[in-house]
């Protein structure tokens, strides 16, 4: 049984300090925030991939933006986390024994603000010296997650937000 547990453990890669940022660009304002509190697990046997991050983990350059983001838009007291559960659909084409850059397609469910959507995301896995780095850039429509922007600032915030992901995975926690 111990041998089985060790074998299963070795197939999972983890990060507790992954990076996710978002960007909203309009002609009136550029809004950016970063979150380094991203937890993720990659199962190298199946290609299953999970992410979880605290909404309050996003940091803004302006504290007032951070306050509005948490209280008015994402309602982080009511919806404290964003999560993704999915699978790398082209996992069988990834060779973990060979350093390189591998394009990946990820399919799964993205949940935030109390809503869940099916998403298809493209990304890259970088394999180097036994480490895996996952990277992706994709967009999210605020309306898909019923995130409402007050009319007063509607022109300041893009309806589509760019999300960037960068996670360095390791065997150990």
Regions found by a protein language model. Name each.
Residues 1-13:
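Bacterial Sec-dependent N-terminal signal peptides
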Residues 10-173:
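Low-complexity, acidic/polar, glycine-enriched regions of mature
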